[in-house]
């Protein structure tokens, strides 16, 4: 997505949350008018409590831990495995920041090594990189052959929020 669109997914997420026309924005303001802005403060690391964004965007965040375990499972490798439960049990909050007890350091080291091995053995593997390029080329060609105008903004790097949520499997394949 980012390779074609040239916009980071974090920025796209913030744009969608703040756009009054999106379903997510409408759902959030039903709960609290300030909720969209508060979520964006967390996503952009501007929240007053660092712990709030460290959980979702740091070297030891939920997203990284999730995709490592999920990708290790999906690829059938053991490279991305680490002791998630142990890490979670040893996490602490100190001065509004996330910390790890010393007894959890070996689990953190395993996590770091899992990331290292997954990058070198899976994510940066020549086959994986060539598939990435082939998928990009497929979408470019598919959009031309099917004359799908909804792909134009993506391929031109000018994708609006409306264009983004119009890109669904129905428009692609039917």
Residue spans for each PLM region:
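Histidine-centered, transition-metal-coordinating active-site segments
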Residues: 2-174
